[in-house]
Amino acid sequence: MKLTAEQIQANWQKFLANIKEHISGNRGEQLLNFYKRYEERIILMPAAHKKEYHNAFPGGYVEHVNRVVAASLKIYDVWCEFEMDKSTFTIEELVFSAINHDLGKMGDEENESYIPQTDKWRRDKLGEDYMFNKKVPFASVPDRGLFLLQSHGIQYSFNEMLTIQTHDGLYDEANKKYLFAFMPEQKPRTSLPFIVHQADLMAARVEFEREWLPKLKGKQGSLDKLKENYTLGTTPNSSKKLSTKTKALSSMKSDGLKNMLDKL
């Protein structure tokens, strides 16, 4: 999978629009300022380091987050239809949690988490187009994301903290203390974490199906061929329309970002 420059730009505008529409007051401004500060990094981030995972290509992170936001709002309606207690959280908390659920993947203020893999063998044999940046101290994705928010003065509610912390559900052993409880007083007192987890799970699954099901059916060559590095742009995209790309690039203020996207 490879996104064009205009697709990446459109996804970024949608990402910012979600903040403007759903995050109110001073916190909304703080969140916009935070993401604009790290725009050149976040706009090209992959959602994962390995192409067998979901959206492991430039721009994959923002596309994934947008999908999780949209899915969260749809799944909210389903839960409401089945008589969920809507009074336990707000739509703003829902969207804030979805937007920031994977924020920890950006790394720290100085260094990005995912950098291009330098080991050819690992790229070709293990499908690792990216590797983890050793300059970034270890932290789980939820912990780092919450730290980044608070270190930039962006406040979050208990509901939002719990949801970001547990968005991987019981796939993450660390979440058992919150989700694997039997006593009523120990269970989450809102359905918000379950909605965002289901949205994230569905988004990742859809992204897997889009990338891999046609290939596994043999429509695009053998699996050995599919192990080749393709997500970082080794396969040219002949469908690009220069005029559309030029229009997308012309709307950007950052010369550095224009240069990066122009090479896609």
Region locations from a protein language model:
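Non-catalytic interface/linker regions that flank or bridge core catalytic/transmembrane domains
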Residues: 1-47, 51
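N-terminal leader/capping segments at the start of a protein or of a new domain
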Residues: 1-18, 198, 202, 212-222
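A glycine-rich, hydrophobic loop/mini-helix early in the fold
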Residues: 32-90
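Divalent metal-dependent catalytic cores for phosphoryl transfer on phosphate-bearing substrates
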Residues: 54-57, 63, 75, 81, ...
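Catalytic or ion-coupling anion/metal-binding cores of large enzyme and transporter domains
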Residues: 223-225, 229
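Intrinsically disordered, low-complexity mixed-charge segments
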Residues: 227, 241, 245
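Extracellular secretome segments
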Residues: 229-236
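Short linear clamp-binding motif
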Residues: 245-264
